[in-house]
Amino acid sequence: MCGIFYTSAPALPTIIAAARTLSKRGPDASSEQTVDGNFFAFHRLAINDLSSAGMQPFVTNKFAFVCNGEIYNSKRLRKLFNINFVSNSDCEVIPYLILKYGIVTTLSMLEGVFAFVFLDRTNNEILSARDAIGVKSLYMGTQKYTLAIASELKAL
């Protein structure tokens, strides 16, 4: 189980402290990163890719992405792309699917359990989803003009 945290707010001390309340969900490593004014945190329990390459968020010039999940058909989905993925993480394929097929089709293609946040850096748009059953929890809250999304309610 990993912990993910996102907010459209800057990385203020209170925001960082909130994100760190999820650290028990990822005992292997933690990462905090601001991308285009959006704050991402990831607490990792390494399962599929034990190397540092599997650390999130995954960030390119097109997206930033964090995910707590297990994508059972990730190897088959990776074959849809002629790119070199930076890791062996089963979640890394998801943002590429979103960019190519859109969120609705991507969700129908995924086999597994997941909760994620995707920042489209081109359109400055946030997309977030979880598996239909809700095996991987995901909570969202707003305050004024700020959006926050986390693996556990206590981080909000």
Segments predicted by a language model, with ranges:
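Cysteine-centered catalytic environments shared across enzyme families
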Residues: M1-L156
